[in-house]
Amino acid sequence: MKLTLAAAVAVTTFIGRAVADIDPIVIKGSKFFYSSNNTQFYIRGVAYQQDYTANSTTTTTSSSSTTSTSYIDPLSSKTTCERDVPILQKLNTNTIRVYAIDPTANHDDCMTLLANAGIYVIADLSDPTESINRDDPRWEIALYNRYTSVIDAMAGYKNTLGFFAGNEVSNTVDTTDASAFVKAAVRDMKSYISSKNYRSGLGVGYATNDDKEIRVAMADYFNCGEEADGIDFWGYNIYSWCGDSSYKDSGYQDRTEEFRNYSVPVFFAEYGCNEVTPRKFTEVEALYGDVMSEVWSGGIVYMYFQEDNDYGLVSVIDSTSVSLLADYTYYSSRINAVSPSGTNKASYTPTNTALQSCPPVTSASWLATASPLPPTPNSALCSCMEQTNACVVDSSVSSSDYADLFSVVCGLTDCTGVSANGTTGSYGAYGMCQPKQQLDWALNKYYSEQGVASACDFSGSATTTSTVEATGSCSSMISQVGTDGTGSVTGTATGSATSTTGTSGAGRVVAGGALGGVLRALL
């Protein structure tokens, strides 16, 4: 069935009128509610983003500059949103999940269309090139800036429900150490939302995969320790109900019992097994039925667009029309037939308020310590350190060669201070800095220890440079960190540095990317 923009005019006529005063969603205990009344909110969601492997797009920003991304921002095109919002409405959709947006793009048109249709948005904070890497985890300045920029772009819309700070980052026991870095991101994004005085109902959560070896420990870890560090909601990517399965055989019964006493809302962040086609979505009745709806706050079906993975509800014909697939028809009949009764907010007193016990670190089952977490990225500290380095990497050295140079210098000086270890909870003060800043620190540390000009050469890969004497807050931060970089900074940095010449005091770094792998091999 082909549905064009023109054919949807009757459905979307109201969209061009005044913007709907959509009611923001709030969290109370383990449930979502509309903020202005006592009605519980159940997510009837659809994952809404074309494949990351699609051709790059160029987005024009409000300043008339252009930016190129390796993904298609699903909220930046008024034309496509005008095409798709009516179709989402027919599915009784009240939430979409978007996996990557361009924070420099203008999202007003799409967010208005969605708001007028009563549709909320959960946005992932990462993008295909900027996310926490399970094989080489780090929480550093570039990621912090990416994540906060997405929050800045979306926080002003009343129909922004919240954000995911990660998606299936840890997916085996061997990669669970990465969860420490994701939890640090959750902590810092929650703190950022508060510091910016954004709407208090905006939540930060995580979307996990359904791995039997780690699923319980994952849920416990992100909901243990300090409440300020934990997730506001928990998304579960689950594909265990295939074809005409059942509440018991699919594992839904076990998962429901596991989360019965969880203290924050839980929902399916992705669901819709396609091992049996067409997908008849018989799980919808169970998910929104009386038993599961006591625990789960609905779910997000995967996905709107048909791609090579064959999960689509529609196939795109062009910018104004799509073809409805068989899955669309089956899902529509199921989702439009459910109506969970829900809980009255006024009479609801949460009883499951206790946080989970943190999973112990063992080589066989869990590798992330709950405390301490990686430090909050501090660009001021990194800048102060950078300006006080007398020996730095030469400008002729390609960034692709940083790892090799790092392995050499760390074979000559103690680089323990630059490691980041989610299992032991050992994090360097400069661990959030950029790779060049980290390499500069290591080179300068060795140079300062040797005290001779030849110590800053490395076959032409390093060079001496004029330095800046740290003053004020910069001096205080550098002092707190120490020359070996094992200290920590207290308070907020606002200092600067003044120009002088001479040798520097050193800072401390944690290497990300290729450098991180080198460090783990050396330390």
Regions found by a protein language model. Name each.
Residues D21-A117, I151:
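Active-site-adjacent substrate/metal-binding segments within catalytic domains
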Residues T61-S62, T67-L88, A142-D152, E213-E227, ...:
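Short, acidic/polar
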Residues T80-I132, V182-G205:
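Aromatic-lined substrate-binding rim segments of carbohydrate-active enzymes
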Residues Y147-D177, G205:
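Active-site groove signature of glycoside hydrolases
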Residues D177-E294, S321-D327, Y348-L367, S371:
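Noncatalytic carbohydrate-binding groove/subsite architecture in carbohydrate-active enzymes
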Residues K280-P350, Q438-L443:
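Substrate-binding cleft of secreted/luminal carbohydrate-active enzymes
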Residues P372-S499:
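Secreted/extracellular ectodomain signature
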Residues S499-L523:
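Cleavable C-terminal sorting propeptides in eukaryotic secreted/cell-surface proteins
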